[in-house]
Structures are given as structure tokens and as C-alpha cells.
A protein has these predicted regions:
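Conserved alpha-helix/loop element of class I SAM-dependent methyltransferases that forms part
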Residues: 6-26
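Hydrophobic beta-strand segment of the Class I
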Residues: 74-75
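A short glycine-rich, Lys/Arg-flanked "PGG" loop and its adjoining helix->strand segment in the class I
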Residues: 87-102
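Conserved class I S-adenosyl-L-methionine
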Residues: 105-129
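Catalytic activation segment of kinase domains across protein kinase-like and atypical kinase folds
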Residues: 124, 129, 381-440
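Acceptor-substrate binding/catalytic loop of class I
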Residues: 137-157
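Conserved catalytic loop of SAM-dependent methyltransferase domains
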Residues: 168-207
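Conserved ATP-binding subdomain of kinase catalytic cores across diverse folds
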Residues: 241-378
Length: 440
């Protein structure tokens, strides 16, 4: 029985594929060990959301080839990096796939931005070995092979040598990496927002890191280097081509407790939040309710509908192609202080209009003081704090995510989205501080 911490780690690592739409009658061959992604697939099979999943090591894949068995999906996450003859295994993987099947391959990138920031190589545990293509690590006969990473072009060449045409291969860039797949971007898609407040870098050796990776993303995007320097890739190979790729971006919120764990999936014209397990269905129903609440108060909001697919909750909205309010406000600050203050004032007015407000009652002030008791205030300080609290407004139904990063700016209006958390009697000044902090 896993504890909650182990469950969270399991969910986070399974996020590399938990958003993917497998068919109910799918047969899956997983190549690797009994790791979180395989356990997730086992869970799908147990819940009859796929037909079956089989496990085999790369070394024993040839036995499957000899049996003549074919699978709808062949999946491997980083396992091929630990073997020398990757090309032979890729050919075997190709041979056990059904004609219209999919190969899903997770691979680390030796040119990942994390390694330029000082993180050590995943396999040699030394700095810059992958960037140098392991010329110092495996140049001598006596050197022991521990594993190695590849660049995107190297991976694609090996896949083509295994039998795939270049048009059969779709790639997704993974940040922060395969161990923490928080964001997944289609290769032809560029994020239209500053990711510094979105992606949280994770490192194998944080003590050797000397650059802040998250502050480099915008420069990589601007100079066309974002995908080439992704920390990892998910490759989806199939002979069946869609006219347009259905998924452009995935953001996972799986480090949360089970009842709030879901993935946000952006396609060409829709955005869908999908529950990781049915325990998160209620949180998506609340999201719909909060959206309707804002709409009822004439606050511009991206409206959506809740439904279920195979027992899992999904909240879907249309895709809005616009800059986030945070980007607009920070850009305004660079142009003119007057423009910046004008936008901030406009947002603060919308915040106050988002809920009925009233002055904090004595009971509410006492409750707030109790939470502040850890500050060690004396009697006079407590009395002053209580007086101050009772002269400040509270939002009767405050939305904790009512901040510029969860808003678009369209036609001189703030258009809110992703309003997950409602807190009754939320002090207005707390939210004003959150709004200000989210901009800076």
C-alpha cells in the first residue's frame, strides 16, 4: 500500500501519458520496468479503459517478435537510453506494432536546457557529458556504459532507420522532464505566455545548478530554440496521419491531492481539463459552478461545460487566442507607468465586483487573529490587528485564482478562466496583494 507521498510521485510521473486518449479495446506492450507509467496502464486495464497491457524488458523483446503477436500501442519511457544497441530494439518495436498502431517513446534530450544550467548528466552523473556527446565518458575500452541521452534529430534518424517515415513521427517537448512532466508542447506549437510562473524546474543535482532555467524560456522561444533545448521528448509514431494534430499543449496539475489532480489539454479549438481519477470529478464541477458565478455577476469569463468520459470528469471551454493579462500588464509597465496603473486599477475593480463584499465581522476577525497567533502578538498588538481587520472588506465568495495570470485581455476587458477555488469571507486586501505579487 502506497502512502500519499508515493501516490503523488506516481501520479506526477504517469502524467507523461495520463492525458493520452487510448481506445477501450487497445492492447498495449510496455517496454521497461514496473514503473509509474506501467502501473498507470495496469490501472487502466483493471478499470477496463484499455483491453490489456503486457510488460517486457528491452532485452527480451525479441521473444515477442518471434511469437508474431502485434499490439495497438508499444510504449517505452527512457528505457532505451540504458542499452547500447538502441537501433536494433527500435526495429523490434516497429515489428510488433499493428499496422495502424502507435509507438509512444519517452526520451531525455542531451541538449536539454537543464544541462546548460549546471545539472549533471542523468547517467554519468557528471557535468556536460551529454552536451559533448559522451566523448570523454565512453571513449576508452575500459569505460563502463551506464546509459546515454540523444538529441531530437538523433532520435528521429534512428526511428527512420527502424522503418518510420519522417512524416510518421510527431514529437512533443517535455518540461521539466520525464520525471516531472508538468508541461508538454507539440513541436510546431509555441507557448504564447511567459512560462516563468508556470514551469517549476526540477534537477537531479540542484547543488550544481548555476543558472535559473525558468528565466531562460522566453529567450529560447523568441530565438526559435525552445523545442531544440527541451529537457525531454515524447514521440508519437504512426502510419495513420490526422489532418491536424489534436493536442497542442498539456499542462499537468498532478502533484496535488487526488481530488484536485487533473490535466489541462489544449487542442486546435478547445481547452479541456480532464480528471486523473474520478475522485477529482467534483473539483471540475466546482470549476463550472465558479465560472457560472462570475458570469452571473457580469464578469467576463471563458464559459465551459462539464461532462464525463469513461467515468472521468472533463470541463471543456473554447480556446482563446490572446495574451494573458499578466503579459499585457507587465508590458504596459515597460511602456508607461500611467498605462500600468490604469490596467491595475481596472483589474482591482473587476476583483471587487467578482463577489458581494462586506466589512469583516467581530467573529471573523477573531477567527483570523487565531490563525495569526503564531506571530506572537501581545494584547495591544492583537487589539490593533482586530480593529484593522474590522475596517477592511471581505469577499463573501472570493475566488482565490482571480489573478492576471488566469485572465486574458481582450477588447479592453479582462476575461477570466481557471477559477478553481472559492473561499468564503476572503479578505479583499489579501487578494489585492495576490494580484500585485502575481504581476511582479
Amino acid at each position: 500500500m502506497k502512502n500519499e507521498e508515493e501516490n503523488i510521485i506516481h501520479r506526477v510521473q504517469a502524467g507523461i501519458l495520463s492525458w493520452y486518449g487510448f481506445g477501450l479495446d487497445s492492447s498495449v506492450l510496455y517496454i521497461g520496468d514496473k514503473e509509474p507509467v506501467y502501473e498507470y496502464l495496469q490501472q487502466l486495464a483493471h478499470e477496463e479503459k484499455i483491453h490489456e497491457v503486457c510488460l517486457v524488458s528491452p532485452e527480451n523483446l525479441s521473444e515477442i517478435c518471434l511469437s508474431g503477436r502485434k499490439y495497438d500501442y508499444v510504449i517505452s519511457i527512457a528505457a532505451l537510453e540504458k542499452i547500447k544497441d538502441v537501433r536494433s530494439v527500435l526495429k523490434e518495436m516497429y515489428s510488433v506494432l499493428s499496422g495502424d498502431g502507435h509507438l509512444l517513446l519517452g526520451m531525455n534530450n542531451r541538449f536539454g536546457i537543464r544541462y546548460f544550467c549546471g545539472d549533471r548528466d542523468k547517467y554519468t552523473h557528471r557535468n556536460f557529458d551529454g552536451i559533448e556527446n559522451y566523448r570523454r565518458a565512453y571513449s576508452k575500452v575500459e569505460d563502463t556504459f551506464c546509459g546515454c541521452m540523444y538529441s531530437l534529430e538523433e532520435i528521429k534518424r534512428m526511428l527512420q532507420a527502424a522503418g518510420w517515415h519522417k512524416d510518421d513521427i510527431s514529437s512533443y517537448s517535455v518540461f521539466s522532464g520525464l520525471d516531472y512532466p508538468q508541461y508538454i508542447f507539440a513541436e510546431e506549437y509555441m507557448p504564447n505566455e511567459d512560462l516563468v510562473n508556470r514551469i517549476r524546474p526540477k534537477y537531479g543535482y540542484p547543488e550544481t545548478v548555476f543558472l535559473e532555467e525558468d528565466h531562460l524560456y522566453s529567450g529560447l522561444i523568441e530565438n526559435g530554440m525552445f523545442h531544440k533545448m527541451a529537457n525531454a521528448y515524447l514521440l508519437d509514431c504512426s502510419h495513420v496521419h490526422n489532418d491536424s494534430r489534436p493536442v497542442l499543449e498539456v499542462s499537468n496539475s498532478l502533484e496535488r491531492l487526488q481530488d484536485h489532480a487533473f490535466s489541462t489539454i489544449i487542442s486546435r479549438d478547445t481547452v479541456s481539463k480532464k480528471a486523473y481519477q474520478k475522485e477529482a470529478n467534483d473539483s471540475l464541477k466546482i470549476l463550472e459552478s465558479n465560472t457560472n458565478l462570475l458570469e452571473s455577476r457580469n464578469i467576463p469569463v471563458v464559459t465551459g461545460k462539464y461532462h464525463e468520459q469513461n467515468g472521468l470528469g472533463v470541463f471543456s471551454t473554447k480556446l482563446i487566442q490572446a495574451d494573458t493579462a499578466r503579459s499585457v500588464i507587465t508590458n504596459a509597465a515597460e511602456e508607461s507607468s500611467d498605462k500600468f496603473y490604469e490596467l491595475m486599477d481596472l483589474f482591482m475593480k473587476e476583483l471587487e465586483n467578482s463577489s458581494e463584499t462586506e466589512m469583516m465581522s467581530e467573529t471573523e476577525a477573531d477567527r483570523a487573529l487565531k490563525k495569526l497567533s503564531a506571530l506572537g502578538m501581545n494584547a495591544r498588538e492583537s487589539a490593533d490587528m482586530k480593529k484593522m481587520l474590522m475596517t477592511h472588506k471581505v469577499l463573501k465568495k472570493g475566488l482565490f485564482d482571480f489573478v492576471p495570470i488566469n485572465s486574458f485581455f481582450v477588447d479592453r476587458q479582462f476575461l477570466m478562466f481557471d477559477q478553481e477555488f472559492l473561499i468564503e469571507d476572503l479578505p479583499l486586501d489579501v487578494m489585492k496583494w495576490r494580484v500585485t505579487a502575481s504581476v511582479y
